[in-house]
Amino acid sequence: MPAPAFPSIAGLLLAGGRATRMDGVDKGLQLLDGTPLALHVLRRLTPQVDETLISANRHADRYAELSAPFDARIIADETPDFPGPLAGLLAGMRAARAPLVACSPCDTPYLPVDLVARLRAALDAQQADIAMAVTVDAQQVRSPQPTFALLRTSLADDLAARLAAGDRKVRAWYARHKTVEVEFRDERAFYNANSWQELAALARR
C-alpha cells in the first residue's frame, strides 16, 4: 500500500549496528523460525506507522528485497564508522517525511503491536519531545528501552551537533530534551538477540 501523501509517523527499523557479540554478522538478516529477524519486526511495526525506513549500513539490496512488500526506504548513516543507534536515528529523522519517527531495533521480533499508539498518546499528553518505552517486571523493576521510542524530527539538528561532538549515548541525548517514559508490563515483548545464545532463546519463546 502506498504511503500517505502527508504521513504523521515514520517507522524506523534500526539495522545498522556491528553485532560484535555475534561475530559481526548482520543481525537483522539472521533467521528466527526461518524468517529474517528484520522481517519479523517489519510485520509488527509497519501497520503502526505511515511510512517505513530501514537504517542499514550493510546489505542494502537484501533489506530492500525483504522489505519490498512494505514499500520501505533503505537509508544509511552519514558516517562510515558504525557510530551506534544515534546515527541511525539521525539518518531516519532526516529522511522521514513525517514529523515523528518511531524507532525499533531489528532484532526484537515480538515488539508490542500497540507500541506506537501508546508512545504517541504519551507524547501528546505530556507535550514531550521524546516518548520512550520502559519495561516493568513482576518485581516492579523498571528497565528503560531507549531504542523503542517516538521522537520529533525537529530534534535532528541538535542530535547532529551532539554526534559531531562525539556523544554516542542514547539516554544522555534524551536527557537533553523533554522525555516521557511509557510503561509496558510484558517485558518479553522487548526481548532481543545480542548473542547467539539469545537468538536461540528467542526461538524457544
Curated annotation (Swiss-Prot):
Entry-linked InterPro entries: MobA-like_NTP_Trfase, Molybde_CF_guanTrfase, Nucleotide-diphossugar_trans
Residues annotated as binding GTP: L14, A15, G16, K27, D77, D107
Ligand binding (Mg(2+)): D107
GO molecular function: GTP binding; metal ion binding; molybdenum cofactor guanylyltransferase activity
GO cellular component: cytoplasm
Keyword field: Cytoplasm, GTP-binding, Magnesium, Metal-binding, Molybdenum cofactor biosynthesis, Nucleotide-binding, Transferase
Catalytic activity: Mo-molybdopterin + GTP + H(+) = Mo-molybdopterin guanine dinucleotide + diphosphate
Matches recorded under PANTHER family: MOLYBDENUM COFACTOR GUANYLYLTRANSFERASE (PTHR19136:SF81)
Family that this chain belongs to: Belongs to the MobA family.
Protein name: Molybdenum cofactor guanylyltransferase
Organism: Burkholderia cenocepacia (strain HI2424)
